[in-house]
Amino acid sequence: MSSEEHKKKLLYGVHFLQFLDASGAEKKEELDTSTAILKKKKKPNSLIVTDAVNDDNSTISLSNNTMDTLGLFRGDTVTVRGKKRKETVLIVLADDDLDDGSARINRVVRHNLRVKHGDIITVHPCPDIKYAKRIAVLPIADTVEGLTGSLFDVYLAPYFRDGYRPVKQGDLFTVRGGMRQVEFKVVEVDPPEFGIVAPDTIIHSEGEPIQREDEENNLNEVGYDDIGGCRKQMAQIRELVELPLRHPQLFKSIGIKPPRGILMYGPPGTGKTLMARAVANETGAFFFLINGPEIMSKMAGESESNLRKAFEEAEKNSPAIIFIDEIDSIAPKREKTNGEVERRVVSQLLTLMDGMKARSNVVVMAATNRPNSIDPALRRFGRFDREVDIGIPDPTGRLEILSIHTKNMKLGEDVDLETIAAETHGYVGSDLASLCSEAAMQQIREKMDLIDLDEDTIDAEVLDSLGVTMENFRYALGVSNPSALREVAVVEVPNVRWEDIGGLEEVKRELIESVQYPVDHPEKFQKFGLSPSRGVLFYGPPGTGKTMLAKAVANECAANFISVKGPELLSMWFGESESNIRDIFDKARAAAPCVVFLDELDSIAKSRGGSVGDAGGASDRVVNQLLTEMDGMTSKKNVFVIGATNRPEQLDAALVRPGRLDTLVYVPLPDQASREGILKAQLRKTPVASDVDIEFIASKTHGFSGADLGFVTQRAVKLAIKESISAEIERQKQREAAGEDVKMEDEEEGEDPVPELTRAHFEEAMKTARRSVSDVEIRRYEAFAQSLKNSGGSSFFRFPSANEAADSGNTFGEAGNDDSLYD
């Protein structure tokens, strides 16, 4: 994919990985009005940045056609606007080789405008710029280290002499002279902001040099470009904040009041605070930050007074944004708080937001990750008008975020950000930032042998050789998991694959159809208008591989995997068990696509009504909660439930109906071919002698489950290890007896006494082998499986052929006519 296509994909949010929505239909890419504010309007003075041919800090080169269109002449002064409301003043030069619609500016000017190659800048004529009476400039400290003599005589005087250069307060410029390049910053211009340095302009250059760190801190202001993965939410926030602050007349002319406040909510780490800062930087508004807990005070009336001061300050400096972080700490529900202070603070906030003048150009933004614990009076129209859900990003959003975090990183050729984005389900922005830094740290660890920590400096070659590889990202993926799921005990993308599971071909095929097809072929489900299956129940004797199958499913679909052991959900506290189930499904929805594996399902989903005297019917309530969660899931995200039990007859009937756990899969004891497959899968990393007949072992282990066969192979391996260790000890003793030196570590190894598993090991292991499932139990499972088959619909159902249709016979006979029941 070319970089241009890649940009387009990022810009328009093309889905690299397509998942289904609740109805089973793929979400169509729609060009709707909700993101209209993000679209850049094409104007003649909007130009694309390209690299400059000359290295002058005060010029911008345009093509002749562009100059004619904008009514400019060579030598005119123009103001040029870049990103984050940065602007500077430059002199126009003509360039015949330049394309129309492009502008050449050098590295220093690009830095001042916060733009890079390919970004858009706007050019405006500025004929009324005055000559500066005086300017003050200071050098950047690291560029003047070791310099002696007058900076003014060597650098500044030749640079400004007869140049009539325009300058803007806050801009940097570089000057070459005397074998060095020195960087300066314009700290003051009189008259303020812009000015042209004429021969009679006084230039001050006395003072302490500016530290590079202080300058870098100013650069780290976040803008819209630093936010990825929430295009729609960004559009909502921009139209609610930018329009009232920059164009209040829009609302006046249409006759409505501009919005007062926005409440952003979502899981931690999705970028709520970052968004507020970006909006403030890009709009140029005064930004007043209130950290929720900071304004609370033990003195009576002080907390309310702190709030009032914040609002007064913002109104004085309008246009302004007041950002209240963690608003749930200062505005909890009044009926549920015991503290009088919190109640008064909530009331004060309500009156302040009501008392804000309609067009005072102040917008209140608030962020929380617990929107339901905020006082409801705050969430009505006229206070926090709009609530914006900043959720977990989809694969396209994750790719945007990864591109932002890796733009300053040195990446290896093999790094594929699209693959990483596809594999990081459930990761939010902060998780992806942590992933990138972990990958970089791993690269540094690999080069640690080249770095001498006692030295003050590190070789330039070592620094040059650092580059983050895909292998580093793979390592980072292995050690990190999404923050939304950290509270759930077992969340992993398991490392079990289909080939690790021997046999069970029929079961595997059914699972691939139920689980993998909806993820891999969403367009097929969309074509037939079908919503995919949401759950599978494995039942069968213990040790047949039910848990392993669930892990393989999650891995093959590249989904997150939450493993829940039935009994650990139950709690002695009233309502706690149901709450645990609710939390697990909430987490799964947040990290979708996700497989929730409920092991030992019979412990929490027994048939209702039979539990007499059981803690107020706790298990019945747990079943009810489970049923409602599984019904609610279909309307939510890609969450798939797999249940496993070896007592299927005890499960509640409502749980195994179509729409919940609708696919019932009997995982039987393996037949001979499956046993052979299991043994081969278990021994695939083990050296086995060529005369060991796996097929013969499989034929002699009738009635053994996968776990029983695992015991046989494990026992055989243990015997081989024991024999190997005994032989080594024996050899050592013989050496010592012969008076030989004890073998050194780097000496050649003798012949391995036990190089592989032999027949003898298996023969010995089979002596202790036993079946874990009795014939009686097997008959019980098979009877249950048979009863499910028999309770199915008519297996002889078929549509009548054309000539039969003429007879209009009833396919089901008289029994099919149920109308008489209701007569």
Curated annotation (Swiss-Prot):
Keywords associated with the record: ATP-binding, Cell cycle, Nucleotide-binding, Protein transport, Repeat, Stress response, Transport
Pfam families to which the protein is assigned, alphabetical: AAA (PF00004), AAA_lid_3 (PF17862), CDC48_2 (PF02933), CDC48_N (PF02359), Vps4_C (PF09336)
GO cellular component: cytosol; nucleus; VCP-NPL4-UFD1 AAA ATPase complex
Keyword flag Ribonucleoprotein: no
Annotated PROSITE patterns: AAA
Binding-site residues, ATP: 268-274, 369, 405
Acidic residues biased stretches: 743-754
CDD domains hit by this protein: RecA-like_CDC48_r1-like, RecA-like_CDC48_r2-like
GO biological process: autophagosome maturation; mitotic spindle disassembly; proteasome-mediated ubiquitin-dependent protein catabolic process; retrograde protein transport, ER to cytosol
Annotated stretches, region: Disordered: 729-754, 799-823
Biased composition (Basic and acidic residues): 729-742
GO molecular function: ATP binding; ATP hydrolysis activity; polyubiquitin modification-dependent protein binding
UniProt induction comment: Up-regulated when grown with elevated levels of potassium chloride.
Protein family according to the UniProt entry: Belongs to the AAA ATPase family.
Subunit structure: Component of the ribosome quality control complex (RQC), composed of the E3 ubiquitin ligase ltn1, rqc1 and rqc2, as well as cdc48 and its ubiquitin-binding cofactors. RQC forms a stable complex with 60S ribosomal subunits.
PANTHER family reported in the protein's UniProt record: AAA-FAMILY ATPASE, NUCLEAR VALOSIN-CONTAINING PROTEIN-LIKE
General function of this protein: Involved in spindle disassembly, degradation of ubiquitinated proteins and protein export from the endoplasmic reticulum to the cytoplasm. Acts as a chaperone that collects ubiquitinated substrates. Has a role in the endoplasmic reticulum-associated degradation (ERAD) pathway. Component of the ribosome quality control complex (RQC), a ribosome-associated complex that mediates ubiquitination and extraction of incompletely synthesized nascent chains for proteasomal degradation. Cdc48 may provide the mechanical force that dislodges the polyubiquitinated nascent peptides from the exit channel.
NCBIfam families recorded: CDC48 (TIGR01243)
Protein name: Cell division control protein 48
